[in-house]
Amino acid sequence: MSSFISVPDSNLNEPEFTPLTRTQVLIAMGLTAVFLMLVSKLWLQFGSTLLLPVQWLTQDLLIGVGLGLGVTLASSGVYALWGAYRRSADYYLEMVLKPLALPDLIWLGLLPGLSEELLFRGVMLPAFGYDATAILFSSLCFGVLHLSSLRQWPYVVWATIVGGVFGVSALATHNLLVPMTAHVTTNFVSGCFWKWEEYRKSTLKE
């Protein structure tokens, strides 16, 4: 899961919206992460591809954090300007983030950020040619992963674009650490911001 910044909307009356519990969300994140890592492992084991390396370089770590903050800022701009995305993001994040406690945001960053980047950038990019076509294909797959329903297509569009940005960063640095760090940063910061806005709005109503 890739969570992009939004402000909670109290007018979420989607007919298909079913509130999830904290346990359900955490289990879903954990199982999804295990599944994606298993797919990556099997692909590397039986496919003729090599994993994009993870190099622990301070410079690349900082690039990843900066990229994650940039994606978060860009997401807030898209949220403000594109009504369809705003409604889609509100639906998606209300379903995923609302049940979580603050400490859970660590898992929100780490589990999707590491497992999704391992597969979509670490394995798919080298497997499909390590070029622009590979970025496009892996980004489309990444976007589809975030499809909760056809009505939420704007969220998928933005996730695809962000996946492309992460893919470019991987090719530019030849280091999987960059998109991993960016993804974890985006998820964690977006989750914290969403929780803060939810708390602020609840206090204003009192």
Task: Show the residue positions of the predicted features.
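Membrane-embedded alpha-helical segments in integral membrane proteins
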Residues: 34-49, 113-121
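Transmembrane helix-loop-helix hairpins at the membrane interface
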Residues: 85, 94-206
